[in-house]
Amino acid sequence: MQIKSFLLPIVAALLTSVSAADSSNKCSFSKTSITEATAITQLNACSTLDGEITVSGSGIGSIDLSSVKVLKAKLSILNSPSIVSLNFNQLQNITGALVINNATQLNSIDLTQLTNVETLQLVSLPSFAILNLNQGVQKAGTIVLSDTALTNLNGLASFNTIDSININNNKNISKIEFNDLQTVTDSLILSFNNDDAEVKLDSLKWAGNLTIQDVSSIQASNLTSVNGSLLISYNTFDELEFPNLKSVGNSMQIFAHDELTKISFPKLSELDGELEMFNNTQLEEIDFGNLTTIKGAVTISGPFDNLTMENLKLVSGDFQVNSTSDKFDCSAFDKLHEKGKIEGHNYVCTHPANPSSSSKSGSSTQTGKSDSKSSDGSSSSNSSSSSKKGASNVLVVPGMVLTTALGVLLALI
């Protein structure tokens, strides 16, 4: 009893202290929902916002949070068709998240002082054309920019390291340049912006995953490693080259190009996943001259004449190469298969017969299996030569015909 009487005042004091701390921290909001403009004033009284705050509905025309310097909270502005502008002109650090989604009338966002961002998502903002980022973001975690009316990335391209960045479906952005970006630890996605978008990633050295879609050009001259997957599709350039890329840690897919004629990865030595290329309708040349190992399946189809893999030593999966060019040659891959260096259960290498060989063998398709080609060719040539010999052994002389006819006539008489 004495112990209880001794502890009770202490516990009461502690509870009072915690309660006082909570009541005094007016800038920490736990799952707070705001639908009216008057509630924005309370937020703007804070230099630091913490907690989880959601602004939604059509009761707010503009948001002024010009007193906020640090955003520790996750601040979400969702489904707000009436908001036309956001003012965060003193905000320097976002250590939480700023998420703006489906604000159809939003035209401008002022982030003049912003330099550090953990998470910034600007999605489904079809009227959003003005982004003020005078200082430029120097440090970033995750940035998503999707379906906006922005014409450039000024201020969003100054960082040298980022976890992930996804820029997609911004139809007015025709230039995407990250001149300082060296490392993307998770993923870099640049997809379906302006059809003529030009991409420059000349400082990029390492990426977790890389996706490039619907661009007119791509420069990544210093990229040496993609730790995950590399996906290239639906672009309009005629040549694709990664001159210094040495390794890809997962799959590589290149597909759906109508103008692409040449693919070159001259220093790529190891691919730790599948290699897949298809629907590249004008493709003529593929260069993987330094590639030694593919730790997955190979599926390549198209009109290419040359597929250079002269240093290839091992394919861990199935192998299927189908060229529609009669200039293509399967012999190098046939030899690799015969040595057991293509470890998958299925091996196919096809191309139309070369006109010169088809005249001899009569075969329209070569499978890359030397046995079937040589037997077909030899049997055709043997039958052809034997028919010629049979015809040459019959010699008809006109005098012999006349003598025979007279003998028959005299016998009848």
Swiss-Prot record:
Gene3D superfamilies: Receptor L-domain (3.80.20.20). It is found in: Cell membrane; Secreted, Cell wall. Coiled coil: none annotated. A lipid is attached at residue 390 (GPI-anchor amidated glycine). Residues 391-413 form a propeptide. Glycans are attached at residues 93, 102, 172, 209, 222, 227, 279, 290, 306, 322, 382. It is a lipid-anchor; GPI-anchor. Residues 347-390 are annotated as: Disordered. Residues 1-20 form the signal peptide. One of its GO terms (cellular component) is cell surface. Keywords: Cell membrane, Cell wall, Cell wall biogenesis/degradation, Glycoprotein, GPI-anchor, Lipoprotein, Membrane, Secreted, Signal. Residues 356-390 have a biased composition (Low complexity). InterPro entries: CWI-Assembly_Regulator, Rcpt_L-dom_sf. Induction: Expression is induced by growth in hypoxic conditions and by caspofungin and ketoconazole. Expression is negatively regulated by BCR1, HOG1, PLC1, RIM101, SSN6, and SUR7. One of its GO terms (biological process) is cell wall organization. Belongs to the SPS2 family. Cell surface protein required for proper cell wall integrity and for the correct assembly of the mannoprotein outer layer of the cell wall. This is Cell surface GPI-anchored protein ECM33. It comes from Candida albicans (strain SC5314 / ATCC MYA-2876).
